[in-house]
Regions:
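Hydrophobic, Leu/Ile/Phe/Ala-enriched alpha-helical segments that form helix-helix packing faces
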Residues: 20, 71-75, 118-121, 182-189
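Accessory terminal regions of nucleic-acid processing enzymes
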Residues: 168-193
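Conserved beta-strand elements of the Class I
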Residues: 2, 83, 129, 183-186
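Alpha-helical structural motif
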Residues: 12, 40, 113, 175-178
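A Trp-anchored, charged/polar loop motif used as the substrate-binding/catalytic surface
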Residues: 62-73
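Well-ordered alpha-helical segments embedded in enzymatic catalytic cores
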Residues: 15, 67, 113-116
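A cross-family acyltransferase "interaction/gating" segment
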Residues: 33-48, 76-169
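Catalytic core of membrane glycerolipid acyltransferases/transacylases, capturing the structured
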Residues: 1-60
Length: 193
């Protein structure tokens, strides 16, 4: 599966792993390179072959694209669900205001990782899981989760097909895939609104 979700907290990762555990192939995230240095978790993500991205633009963007493609080639060999937090970062009111996002509870989407995954693996995906996570009692911190103070969590999952016209020919970029992902994300904005 190709999985996309909104992103508010580190807790989102725990929630997604819990919701999808043993229901779909293991989730693998496109992860910020800095997170490799987080004790235990960074090593685990490295050992599990999560792709680490620098996300700085320029030459780094080309290196990220190549790293992402290599990761997707490995994903083709082992059942994997490719996960993308489409906003590219955790939502905060300050980031929302700075971006002037057209969505009430979401940042503007960054769909490069989805386009890359569709370019490399499009024909292998069973479907697109459009996930919305809502914390009605307020967004918890990772410490809240560890202390058992998670509160209510609402997870909405919509299984969407990936239209054939969105998939690029092998080796070609996936601009239509990015547009499709943006459309799905816009619908999620309505759910959160």
């Amino acid at each position: 599966y190709l999985v996309a979700s909104n992103h508010q907290s580190w807790v989102d990762i725990l929630v997604l792993q819990r919701v999808f555990n043993r229901r779909i192939p293991m989730l693998k995230f496109f992860t910020k390179k800095e997170l490799i240095y987080v004790p235990v978790i960074g090593f685990a993500w490295w050992a599990l072959d999560f792709p680490f991205m620098q996300r700085k633009g320029g030459a780094s963007a080309r290196a990220d694209l190549e790293a992402g493609r290599k990761a997707c080639e490995k994903f083709r060999l082992v059942p994997t669900s490719v996960m993308s937090f489409v906003e590219g970062t955790r939502f905060t009111p300050a980031k929302h205001a700075q971006q002037k996002s057209p969505y009430r509870h979401l940042l503007k989407p960054k769909v490069g990782s989805i386009g890359m995954a569709l370019e490399a693996l499009g024909d292998a995906f069973t479907g697109f899981l459009d996930v919305t996570i809502v914390y009605p009692d307020g967004t918890p911190t990772f410490t809240d989760a560890l202390a058992g103070r998670l509160g209510n969590v609402v997870v909405r999952v919509h299984l969407r097909s990936i239209p054939a016209e969105v998939l690029p020919p092998p080796g070609e970029p996936a601009p239509r895939a990015a547009v499709q992902a943006h459309h799905a994300f816009s619908q999620s904005g309505g759910v959160l609104g």
